[in-house]
């Protein structure tokens, strides 16, 4: 019975909620955005808005570019030329795609120059490099994590450590992956990435943008000062988070008797927005671009608006080896790691961070 009971239990999920103000010296909003590296979807919702301003629309269209490179040898990411051209000049993120974190070998390059490898046991042993067991591989360690600091490595390319890693990637266990890459930089031509990897199959991409107007949207009433809500006066943060997910899924919020797909209804109390603008950006989006978008949404209330709040939601790649900073990320049954800002018209904000079963508590 105990085993059956465990099988019936839903996997553990965590939702952390906090509130602050963008003007506070100790506000964490910038640090949190900057350390959530691998983002594949960015969505924002603006109640009582039928048309985006030109400035906001232009910003949405400038969320790229990013690149895909097929069958890129891993040793290309540790060369002196690559580190000097990209890692040291700006902020570079890279992530393997078409790989599953719980089944395949996966690799991520973080903007701080850390190269993270999540490898199955056989591959790990064949590389001959030192790492540590994955936190989520069970009692028998079947997956291992290797972390390589490229900035430190580049200080001495004649070191024994560099020669060993280079030998491992080039000769002992050559590994090739399909990569997504995105690079935030200043003062360098955009074509640098294309020309550098010209001998491989490289393509430039722009994120896909979907704009829609939601009519007669039931919206929860919120009080910026109260995450817990107030009976009959305001909804709490968890109720709002559930509601927002339903809106993104285009679920019916009325709980009508004939609806067999969704029995969800908007929490009470609520108001009806005549129209709301929903924008979704999908691709490989850098934290720097997200931070600019967040700042622009804060300025949305510089002039009086009917909307009491707007939201910005960011979802990470389910198969990234890390979630926030260098914290290991696993898939289990969902692989979700995401955060949401509720931006109020007085510059207060709620920050909601959610992760699945194979993750540490969000920062």
From Swiss-Prot:
It is found in: Nucleus, Nucleolus. One of its GO terms (molecular function) is ribonuclease P RNA binding. The keyword Kinase does not apply. One of its GO terms (cellular component) is nucleolus. Keywords: Nucleus, rRNA processing, tRNA processing. It comes from the Eukaryota. InterPro entries: RNase_P_Rpp40. Transmembrane segments: none annotated. Component of nuclear RNase P and RNase MRP ribonucleoproteins. RNase P consists of a catalytic RNA moiety and about 10 protein subunits; POP1, POP4, POP5, POP7, RPP14, RPP21, RPP25, RPP30, RPP38 and RPP40. Within the RNase P complex, POP1, POP7 and RPP25 form the 'finger' subcomplex, POP5, RPP14, RPP40 and homodimeric RPP30 form the 'palm' subcomplex, and RPP21, POP4 and RPP38 form the 'wrist' subcomplex. All subunits of the RNase P complex interact with the catalytic RNA. Several subunits of RNase P are also part of the RNase MRP complex. Component of ribonuclease P, a ribonucleoprotein complex that generates mature tRNA molecules by cleaving their 5'-ends. Also a component of the MRP ribonuclease complex, which cleaves pre-rRNA sequences. PANTHER family: RIBONUCLEASE P PROTEIN SUBUNIT P40. This is Ribonuclease P protein subunit p40.
């Amino acid at each position: 019975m105990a085993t059956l009971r465990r099988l019936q239990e839903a996997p553990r999920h965590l939702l952390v909620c906090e509130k602050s103000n963008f003007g506070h010296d100790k506000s964490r909003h910038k640090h949190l955005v900057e350390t959530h590296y691998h983002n594949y979807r960015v969505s924002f919702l603006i109640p009582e808005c039928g048309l985006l301003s030109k400035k906001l629309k232009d910003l949405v269209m400038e969320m790229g570019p990013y690149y895909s490179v097929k069958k890129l040898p891993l040793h290309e990411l540790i060369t002196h030329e690559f580190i000097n051209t990209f890692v040291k000049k700006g902020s570079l993120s890279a992530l393997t795609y078409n790989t599953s974190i719980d089944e395949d070998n996966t690799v991520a390059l973080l903007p701080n120059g850390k190269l993270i490898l999540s490898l199955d046991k056989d591959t790990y042993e064949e590389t001959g490099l030192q790492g540590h067991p994955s936190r989520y591989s069970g009692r028998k360690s079947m997956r291992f994590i290797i972390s390589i600091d490229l900035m430190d490595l580049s200080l001495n390319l004649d070191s024994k450590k560099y020669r060993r890693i280079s030998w491992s990637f080039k000769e002992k266990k050559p590994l090739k992956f399909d990569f997504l890459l995105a690079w935030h930089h200043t003062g360098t031509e955009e074509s640098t990435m294309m020309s550098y990897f010209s001998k491989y199959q490289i393509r430039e991409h722009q994120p896909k943008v979907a704009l829609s107007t939601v009519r007669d949207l039931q919206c929860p009433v919120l009080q910026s000062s109260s995450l817990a809500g107030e009976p009959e006066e305001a909804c709490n943060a968890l109720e709002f988070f559930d509601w927002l997910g339903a809106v993104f899924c285009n679920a019916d919020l009325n709980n009508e008797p004939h609806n067999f797909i969704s029995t969800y209804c908007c929490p009470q109390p609520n108001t009806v927005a005549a129209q709301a603008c929903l924008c979704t950006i999908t691709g490989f989006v850098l934290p720097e671009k997200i931070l600019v978008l967040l700042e622009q949404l804060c300025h949305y209330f510089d002039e009086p608006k009917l909307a009491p709040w707007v939201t910005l939601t960011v979802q990470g790649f389910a198969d990234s080896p890390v979630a926030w900073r260098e914290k290991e990320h696993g898939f289990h049954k969902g692989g979700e790691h995401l955060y949401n800002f509720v931006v109020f018209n007085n510059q207060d904000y709620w920050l909601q961070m959610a992760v699945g079963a194979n993750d540490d508590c969000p920062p």
